[in-house]
Amino acid sequence: MTVQKSKNPQVDIAEDNAFFPSEYSLSQYTSPVSDLDGVDYPKPYRGKHKILVIAADERYLPTDNGKLFSTGNHPIETLLPLYHLHAAGFEFEVATISGLMTKFEYWAMPHKDEKVMPFFEQHKSLFRNPKKLADVVASLNADSEYAAIFVPGGHGALIGLPESQDVAAALQWAIKNDRFVISLCHGPAAFLALRHGDNPLNGYSICAFPDAADKQTPEIGYMPGHLTWYFGEELKKMGMNIINDDIAGRVHKDRKVLTGDSPFAANALGKLAAQEMLAAYAG
């Protein structure tokens, strides 16, 4: 007899009134191994250009009923794109708004993945000891070695990044200096940092996690309540076009902005980003 997994969010005892996703939702949307494949870059980049990862530094996201969702950056959405980019020859640095450590949704970590987990262990210190984004921004100029800015997904991207002037400055620098911007799922919420000033992403098309899907996740206990705002609605108000209305592992390229719709797009986005960056920097 099959026992139905619970759809009740699981208590996170590290914080008052905080919750992890339900057993049922984890069984549907996480896996102990990833879908990493196609990592084949026979002529990797050998230069000095690298990736700047803007990571989440806050774990708890308030929902409409006062309960907190225990979140952070999604491991698959973070590590698979970086795995491809690293294999293609691009090193990376990590920055957070505060300079404090990256928060991960460890409940989504592919802990039995024989490629992703060693990669994570190899680079864990970068996530534990990130740069402070303001310090990075202060040093940016036309000759800076960052070839791309990567904003991973996970609901942690909804906390702080959309209001950060440092995030806005980093994105403005990237677009104006012909660098790549890479993001997926909830990561594009960081683009909202541009909405109150100079917005070089006006008119761009992207893939992102649909608001409609976010509105459904509390039904299966993925979140302990509904979001208090929806980033897709806000991106559209600032002139961006979200081309997907479902979660199908879709990726999209608009000039040098490369995006994906969900963790199901992480591997494909990694391939796309590696191919595009090799063409630009190693061609």
From Swiss-Prot:
Domain of life: Bacteria
Inducing factors: By heat shock.
Residues annotated as the enzyme's active site: 185
Location(s), subcellular: Cytoplasm
Any one GO molecular function term: glyoxalase III activity
Catalytic activity: N(omega)-(1-hydroxy-2-oxopropyl)-L-arginyl-[protein] + H2O = lactate + L-arginyl-[protein] + H(+); N(6)-(1-hydroxy-2-oxopropyl)-L-lysyl-[protein] + H2O = lactate + L-lysyl-[protein] + H(+); S-(1-hydroxy-2-oxopropyl)-L-cysteinyl-[protein] + H2O = lactate + L-cysteinyl-[protein] + H(+); N(omega)-(1-hydroxy-2-oxoethyl)-L-arginyl-[protein] + H2O = L-arginyl-[protein] + glycolate + H(+)
Gene3D superfamilies (alphabetical): 3.40.50.880
SUPFAM superfamilies named among the record's database cross-references: Class I glutamine amidotransferase-like
Enzyme class per UniProt: hydrolase
InterPro entries, sorted: Class_I_gatase-like, HchA, Prot/Nucl_acid_deglycase
Assembly information from the UniProt record: Homodimer.
Family classification: Belongs to the peptidase C56 family. HchA subfamily.
The protein, known as: Protein/nucleic acid deglycase HchA
Organism listed in the record: Escherichia coli O8 (strain IAI1)
